[in-house]
Design a protein with these regions (language model features):
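Short secondary-structure boundary/capping segments
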Residues: 165, 271-272
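Active-site microenvironments that recognize anionic phosphate/pyrophosphate groups
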Residues: 1-225, 229-232, 306-308, 322-326, ...
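Catalytic or ion-translocation cores adjacent to nucleophile or general acid/base/metal-coordination motifs
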Residues: 238, 247-270, 276-330, 334-337
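Helical scaffold of the NTase/Pol beta-like nucleotidyltransferase catalytic core
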Residues: 196-198, 228-255
Length: 502
């Protein structure tokens, strides 16, 4: 049924009311904004309506109208391009956002980030309605509580959009999703629209960088801090100074970097960037397992953390000393081989050792977690020896990047349906091996059903969630270069001796 013009006007009114109520739009700019939107919707007249719609329903109605009128195809990608364009008209200009952020920063860094985070949600860059679909829980493991999420906020691609994207030639502008040229970019079928993106300029160690929020918000105030230049990821001594340069300006945030090698690195290695935010991860809560001292660095507290991945924690009031020691650890690790522990610095000229660093301020002191990583592949483990092993791929087979390293699993959306179906199949006593969708979970389900004779309709979901948590702990154990065993700790101490000897 075709939408009436009155409904479109009402949806338009609702969108403008929303923008005024959350401070995106100044009342003096309302008529200007309405006329801009009317022009975009190819409407030549307007009458005020009584009918009211909430946000984002009003925005969805305007997309419905555009699709009915043939302005856009009714696909997720085309609707996203269109609704982002509309929100772009209502989002304050970059200079206004920067001015407001800096004004609030004089009150406190937190006041500034609160403003910027709320703006990024209000202007629909972060789509609250999609983020709300993500499933989250915590699971108790032998390493303490780990955090689990099933990522449902990234919509599945429409086959029509995939087909259209194949026909579109890449323009090479912007070079990637992290380049500052994305601000205000209209987007294409294969590159998201960014008219409502705002990036805060920040100085990081004397260089111009940008600071924005991730549209997917895997955790509270999930931000991305990226070099203003399109330059590749590199983990070197300078990275530690850069991380602290940012967290000193925003001491309520942590900031970490993905590693700079494939398999153990992030998904974008072509543009230097860090990820941070206002969230306390399981790794940060993990306690000291044992301390160690490094001669010449008496003012740096060093310990190994009780955690499935290999974490060296450095804490000091002297940032320069701490970063110097981190630089030494990185240099030693890059060059370190211990064949007995299956650690090779390189094979056939390909380097394997790197680090995932995470910086934070803790009670006024500088703290740096160095997670030792290695991307060696073997015949038995072609995707990576220190990567989720094949028997865990039914839950998680993707790379273990910074967010997972810190103790938050980002699991694929397919698991929501698979786990609901698994619950029903187990309660009905079905043979999982005869079920095409669920057969990959059969060995795992057999094992945990043996541990849970109490499994019933009331507790089934809680047991499955708990057991997913145990799988995630195993995933992190796989990614840990030194295992939490006697032989693993002995091998780790051999490396620490290397560090201590300078």
């Amino acid at each position: 049924m075709a939408m009436t013009t009155e409904t479109v006007w009402a949806a338009l009114d609702a969108l403008l009311d929303y923008a005024k109520n959350c401070g995106l739009l100044h009342p003096l700019d309302e008529t200007f904004a309405r006329n801009t939107l009317l022009s975009e919707l190819r409407l030549e007249s307007y009458e005020k309506q009584e009918q009211h719609f909430d946000f984002p329903e009003c925005l969805n109605l305007l997309c419905d109208y555009a699709a009915q009128q043939g302005m856009i195809a009714d696909t997720i990608a085309e609707r996203d391009l269109f609704d982002t364009k509309l929100m772009g008209f209502l989002t304050p200009r970059p200079s206004e956002v920067v001015r407001e952020f800096r004004s609030r920063y004089t009150q406190s860094p937190k006041a500034a980030t609160d403003y910027f985070y709320n703006l990024s949600q209000d202007c629909n860059y972060i789509r609250r309605d999609r983020i709300a679909k993500d499933e989250r829980w915590t699971a108790e493991t032998k390493y303490g509580k780990l955090e689990i999420s099933i990522n449902l906020s990234k919509p599945e691609k429409d086959p029509r959009d995939i087909a259209a994207a194949k026909l579109k030639k890449a323009s090479g502008y912007p070079k990637c999703l992290l380049c500052p040229e994305n601000v205000g970019y209209a987007g294409t079928i294969s590159h998201p629209a960014r008219q409502n993106l705002r990036v805060m300029p920040v100085m990081v160690n004397g260089q111009l960088w940008g600071f924005q929020y991730s549209p997917y918000v895997y955790y509270n105030e999930h931000c991305i801090v990226m070099n203003a230049r399109h330059t590749p990821m590199v983990i070197d001594r300078g990275v530690f100074d850069k991380l602290f340069s940012f967290v000193e300006q925003f001491p309520h945030y942590f900031l970490g970097s993905n590693a700079d090698l494939p398999i153990v690195g992030g998904s974008i290695l072509s543009h230097e960037h860090f990820q941070g935010g206002h969230h306390t991860f399981p790794m940060e809560k993990a306690e000291k397992e044992f301390g160690f001292e490094v001669p010449g660095f008496d003012d740096v507290d060093c310990c190994v953390v009780r955690y499935p991945m290999t974490v060296l924690r450095l804490n000091s009031q002297n940032k320069d000393h701490l970063c110097d020691l981190a630089g030494r650890i990185l240099a030693r690790w890059r060059a370190y081989s211990d064949p007995a522990a299956m650690i090779f610095a390189e094979t056939d000229g390909e380097p394997h050792n790197t680090i995932t660093p995470i910086a934070r301020m803790r009670e006024g002191r500088h703290e740096l977690d160095l997670v030792l990583r290695n991307n060696l592949t073997t015949k038995e483990h072609p995707m990576g020896l220190y990567h989720p092993h094949e028997e865990l791929h039914h839950i998680k087979k993707e790379n273990i990047g910074l967010i997972e390293v810190m103790g938050l699993a980002v699991l694929p959306g397919r698991l929501k349906k698979e786990m609901a179906d698994l619950r029903e199949a187990l309660l009905n006593g079905e043979n999982l091996r005869e079920n095409e969708e669920l057969s990959k979970h059969a060995d795992w389900a057999d094992a945990f059903m043996a541990r849970h004779p109490e499994f019933n309709a009331e507790n089934a979901e809680a047991i499955i969630q708990y057991e997913i948590g145990q799988v995630f702990a195993q995933v992190l154990e796989c990614a840990g270069v030194y295992k939490c065993t006697e032989s693993g700790r002995a091998a780790l101490k051999r490396f620490l001796t290397e560090v201590q000897n300078g």
